[in-house]
Amino acid sequence: MSASDLTSVQAAAPQGSRQILVTSALPYANGQIHIGHLVEYIQTDIWVRALRMHGHEVYYIGADDTHGTPIMLRAEKEGLTPKQLIDRVWTEHKRDFDSFGVSFDNFYSTDSDENRVLSEKIYLALQEAGLIAEREIEQAYDPVKEMFLPDRFIKGECPKCHAKDQYGDNCEVCGSTYLPTELLNPYSVVSGATPVRKTSKHYFFRLSDPRCESFLREWVSGLAQPEATNKMREWLGDAGEAKLADWDISRDAPYFGFEIPGAPGKYFYVWLDAPVGYYASFKNLCERNGIDFDAWIRPGSKAEQYHFIGKDILYFHTLFWPAMLEFSGHRTPTNVFAHGFLTVDGAKMSKSRGTFITAQSYIDTGLNPEWLRYYFAAKLNATMEDIDLNLDDFQARVNSDLVGKYVNIASRAAGFLIKRFDGRVQDSAMNHPLVAKLRDAIPQIAASYEAREYGRALRHTMELADEVNAYVDGAKPWDLAKDPANAVALHETCSVSLEAFRLLSLALKPVMPRVAAAVEAFFGIAPLAWADAAKPLSSAQPIKAYQHLMTRVDAKQIEALLAANRDSLQADAAGAAAGGANAAKDAKSNAKANAKPAVVNGADDAPISIDDFAKIDLRIAKIVACQAVEGSDKLLQLTLDVGEEKTRNVFSGIKSAYQPEQLVGKLTVMVANLAPRKMKFGLSEGMVLAASATDEKAEPGLYILEPHSGAKPGMRVK
């Protein structure tokens, strides 16, 4: 290697070691890790590994989010204490993260002494600052279970479209939002009883305080993602608008969580102590390893603090969390990085299609975790864009990039080097122009990782792999090996190929750490860091016998994975049926004991006559345009051709299942004679029909009805 080569590589390395604390959002301890979760943990882990390869002091912290009503109720249903449930789920989550190479320095639990102490300390500091308010509020109360009910634990009939079994805050059929008090025939999803209204004292974090607003307006300017900045400014509004609302941080007993100091029977809402769990997990690590915790979290700390999250929880991490930290005497996050959602084959993950894929089913089916790490990395960038796991593309990309391009290089050269040259490279070959080009590219690839542009880093890497393969194809070592007179040329070809392979492995190490470890063992070298681009292979260290590093993805493995997850749906359904029967018995006996009958779903679904059905005008409609509704998380605006002179405008609550571009040009079925309804987004002139499971938690998914292609807009369905 020339002196100039060495200088260029070293100049790209960061000057001085940084202290960096990194977190991913905490998984809720109420279910399994699935591939949608893994997008975030893999994204964070790649970033952390890339920074560690610079020699920085980096700590990647995680924990299970363990508090709240859902965990309390699930534990009761399973005959466990909440502690027993969260301990079991922690073991399952830790197993899954280990399987996918997620390299937490500490994976802990929010149900810890450290978290209790820190949550109380932050709360008391906010109280001292005059940022905690007490107010009486009215809530729904379950008289059978003797507990207050969150909105999502109340169901009933939508007051607008009269769809049954809708949640207490919004209708998933027509997209309306409303108060739980407006629901018709409401019932508790916990017991089936009719809720009553009760008042209770609650505690609020005064986010509307001018101090909070002023701080957040300044803090938002430092966010790395323009989408996040724009969203925060939308929430903040213009100066003087006072759009920020105070945040209810308390819940009433019974509740699984931490009791609020000086407020018996009142508990911290899970979203207060969950982010504090980042610090609690780090404090636990610090105490075990002699790290100065306070030096990392005090105001003005030189340490950096980053949070990777899904875009759905941006509100908590860019409003409440930084404000809580600022006014409780802590440093604030350096930045928050939000990612998009995962779809599978262009649609929301579905248990019925087998695409609601759990981490454990992926491992049990025998698929390589580093295949998925590579595929996700190839799709990820620094924006909040959603990413799609296309299973055909997954198979093709892994087989082409990783097997056909990358590991193929080593397999083509290693045998010749061991057999003909005792496994020792030709030192002069380390200055070959191709090797120099790869070496010069390493700083650019490392910079792409730090910028969270993983797709760019991998495209660059695979372009270089193409050049290496073209070099091997041109040199034809298999032909050179036939004539002893070509020994020098053969030695050079194999040496260049293997040094290039080492550099490609360095470039891929943040994404595929296990393959990188196998490559390090193959070459007999220390763990690779970015600075090692300048340390080529040497004839002083012979390589070891080549072992296969990766196999191809087989279509049968994909089929088995989908089948395994469809089977799990059937098992869940059987369990839900049994559980539902038991719950019905319990609700009946509880209701009897309280002299109040429980509501039974569907009891009023009396048969209708053919005349009743004839009143509904169902028409074929063509979706000629579709767009997301700004300000709504659920609605799409459809422009429909119904065979009339003018198109119709319809709002539909199917945003969770479809991207707008997926629907344009499709035929569907609409209720054409439904009275137009004025919504805050505009006038809705009908309703499109969509199917969903009765229990959408057990089987999520919405599916619009699509007639055969021979149908035409305006045709009547009868």
UniProtKB/Swiss-Prot annotation:
Cofactor list: Zn(2+)
Gene, per the UniProt record: metG
GO molecular function: ATP binding; metal ion binding; methionine-tRNA ligase activity; tRNA binding
Xref: PROSITE patterns: AA_TRNA_LIGASE_I, TRBD
Quaternary structure annotation from Swiss-Prot or TrEMBL: Homodimer.
UniProt function note: Is required not only for elongation of protein synthesis but also for the initiation of all mRNA translation through initiator tRNA(fMet) aminoacylation.
One record GO biological process: methionyl-tRNA aminoacylation
GO cellular component, one term: cytosol
Residues holding Zn(2+): 158, 161, 171, 174
Listed EC numbers: 6.1.1.10
Pfam families per the UniProt record, alphabetical: tRNA-synt_1g, tRNA_bind
Ranges of residues in domain tRNA-binding: 612-718
Protein name, per record: Methionine--tRNA ligase
Similarity field: Belongs to the class-I aminoacyl-tRNA synthetase family. MetG type 1 subfamily.
Keyword Aminoacyl-tRNA synthetase: yes
Binding site for ATP: 351
Lineage, opening ranks: Bacteria, Pseudomonadati, Pseudomonadota, Betaproteobacteria, Burkholderiales
Organism of provenance: Burkholderia cenocepacia (strain ATCC BAA-245 / DSM 16553 / LMG 16656 / NCTC 13227 / J2315 / CF5610)
UniProt keyword list: Aminoacyl-tRNA synthetase, ATP-binding, Cytoplasm, Ligase, Metal-binding, Nucleotide-binding, Protein biosynthesis, RNA-binding, tRNA-binding, Zinc
